[in-house]
Amino acid sequence: MTTSEEVVKASQTATTGGRKFDGDKLQYGLLPPLALKATVEILTFGAKKYEPDNWKHVPDSKRRYFDAMQRHLWAWKEGEQNDPESGKNHLAHALCCLMFLYEHDIMYSVDDNS
């Protein structure tokens, strides 16, 4: 039995003459481009202020980045769009903090508080 996905692939192949089986691969194009750009802007700001990848070496990072994320979320919730120091959106700052927390959670044991 032919699935709808196979029909689409067959019609694309018939039209272009080429094949590429990437249905099970990650689709980075699904990332929201504006949020991604804003996050990279925050990371660049931080790299200039401190140094690239400084976030990996911050003591007590889980607590500190969780607190920073909350501060940015609360500032945004209270109506402040941009961080006064960076001039960048509070939600982008919060996204960076969340990404740092996620990376630390994966890189280190869950019990580690580094």
Outline where the language-model segments fall.
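Intrinsically disordered, low-complexity regulatory regions
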Residues: 1-114
